[in-house]
Amino acid sequence: TAESPQVRFDWAKTLSELVDERYLTPIDAWARENGTRFRAQVYGFPPPTLSSNALVALPEGEGADWRSFTSTRWASSAAHLYDKPVVSSEVWTWLHSPSWAATPLDMKVEADRHFLQGVTQLIGHGWPYSPPEAEEPGWAFYAAAALNDHNPWYGVMPDVTRYLQRVSFLLRQGTPDNSVAIYLPIEDAFAAMRPEAASVNDAMHRRVSDALIGQVLDAGYGFDFVDAGAIAAGGV
């Protein structure tokens, strides 16, 4: 019916508000009360918005393709808008999958692509458990770089991590200064949302084109994503 988009919008927005009010806010408060900080990948199902990242101490993303919409820039944009100097990203999860194929240079390249998107802390994926009795090269998770002492290049891991440490530290010292804001059509996503696909983040992959992002980058500009919540909060 003609009213269906409005009904879907109200339903999706209610889900988003419940995620903010009943999940993100109380867990962040609990973490602070217990002397720690809540790090969260604030996307997926049900549908948090970009500004939902403001409710956690440490937003985290994933996705190395800096010329596309990614959860990485989703998280870093919110961190810039809401003054959070530490924003992390899950890295190397699918790097030359299966395991053992990635080299230290491969790891550096992917890390740099996250730094380009505004990340200031890397969460390496991963270090799978391997029992002592397992034959070499031990157990490995199918989807990740193997960051453990079964890897033949493990001896140079300190050199890799020192580079990543220095870059992460330096990126936290400055102030983000992107010239372009790309408005995320979250309201349109709400109006089209259905129970089997209730994710704002997934919807943005379809609504924010690679061509748009490429145009901005090729013109020499940096950018952040924004949403209605960030504008209302005065972050833009």
Language-model segments: what does each one mean?
Residues 1-236:
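Carbohydrate-binding surfaces of carbohydrate-active enzymes
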